[in-house]
């Protein structure tokens, strides 16, 4: 697995710079190394984890494809600056599994399936809310004035006699 390098004494303030440094491949003297677990801790502490689909893709990229692709996805995630504290534990579990040797592949698969279910539920909720917003209730028909009908009926009865 790859490691991210931060060229600063305050990594909490410059975490996106750490990912950018990793992507560019530049080196520095006072390096702080980031493992995928440390990346998750930074993301959760900065409250920038949401977009579980991107998290899922990044974890798969970190585990299967290449650390650089995973880091690029993480950079996009950090740049989004969106927050969802409820999903941070799922994100942390995914990246912890992606960065470590997998002892039990069933747990890894379970976490990915769980994340996919959460993503689909969030997407369904967004679609449902958009549909609810676009379909406006139709106006009820105007109330019928019974007095007019009664007058017309009375006139008809009067003239028909």
From Swiss-Prot:
The keyword Transmembrane helix applies. It is found in: Host membrane. The keyword Cell membrane does not apply. The chain crosses the membrane at residues 102-129. It comes from the Viruses. Keywords: Early protein, Glycoprotein, Host membrane, Membrane, Transmembrane, Transmembrane helix. One of its GO terms (cellular component) is host cell membrane. Glycans are attached at residues 14, 87. It is a single-pass membrane protein. This is Early E3 17.7 kDa glycoprotein. It comes from Murine adenovirus A serotype 1.
């Amino acid at each position: 697995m790859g490691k991210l390098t931060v060229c600063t004494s305050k990594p909490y303030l410059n975490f996106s710079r750490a990912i950018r440094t990793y992507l560019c491949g530049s080196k520095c003297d006072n390096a702080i190394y980031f493992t995928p677990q440390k990346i998750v801790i930074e993301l959760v502490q900065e409250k920038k984890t949401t977009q579980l689909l991107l998290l899922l893709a990044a974890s798969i990229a970190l585990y299967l494809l290449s650390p650089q692709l995973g880091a690029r996805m993480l950079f996009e995630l950090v740049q989004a600056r969106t927050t969802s504290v409820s999903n941070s534990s799922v994100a942390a579990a995914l990246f912890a599994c992606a960065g470590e040797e997998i002892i039990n592949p069933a747990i890894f698969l379970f976490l990915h399936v769980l994340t996919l279910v959460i993503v689909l539920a969030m997407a369904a909720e967004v679609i449902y809310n958009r549909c609810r917003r676009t379909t406006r209730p139709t106006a009820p028909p105007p109330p019928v004035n019974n007095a007019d009908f009664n007058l017309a009926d009375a006139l008809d009865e009067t003239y028909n006699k």
